[in-house]
Amino acid sequence: MVSTLDSQARAQQFRRDQDRQGSRTDQQMRRSTFTDGAVTYGAVGGTQAADLLYYPPAGYRPLERTVRLGSGPERFETAVAALMTWGVQRRSGFEVTDVHEGTGEHYTGIAYDDQGTPLGLQERAEREAVFAEDGSPYISNGMTAVLKVPVGPFTLSAPVRVVYVVDEPTRIGYAYGSRAHHPVSGEEAFFVELHPDGAVTFTIRRFSRPATRMGRLFGPVVRWQQRRITTRYLRALLPARSA
């Protein structure tokens, strides 16, 4: 029990240190070029934390949802191709505009042991450009875009920056963070995974909060809209949508 409490205490202290490191990372990003775009929060890469749902960045609401997409390597590859070319957003009714590659700067994330204790920052790995069969470039580190989100009779602009990409043999995905003028502040991550039993799953993780005073006043409405969008996201890679 003492060992478990010590591990949790170390994790919380590391998270506080990481929040401070995230603030420094954010400041570095803010010194980047206009093309790169600056994120509007400090805990960059926080969606990789194993204990996100229990210890989210202060003031933010966490979320994690997973849906099964089917099974087998072919289903995995099909889902990955859609995920990494903005398929989740487009199939959810969004328009993806103003896409720029950026410089490739990214947050490398935190490494954890089997008990969830943080070990430190992961080593940074360079990733070659990847393209889909139709020539569409895969989402890459530092890429920026503006999502056009339909909300009733209105369309909201949501500028984002890709802060990291996960490229493992059986787990692929990315996360983007909010930029200036995004209606919410925070980070959202999307992963497709091929499990040892052959199952293919799609997971969404995020932490967020309204970015404006008006948004905070209408917090329940904002969260309701986010739930609707999350439901669309989870359906976007289902086989029926991919056909």
Where are these regions (language model features)?
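A conserved amphipathic terminal alpha-helix motif
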Residues: 31, 210-243
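Compact beta-sheet-dominated globular domain cores
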Residues: 194-198, 203-209
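Short, solvent-exposed aromatic-acidic interface loops
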Residues: 178-182, 205-212
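Hydrophobic ligand-binding cavity/cleft-lining segments
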Residues: 2-146
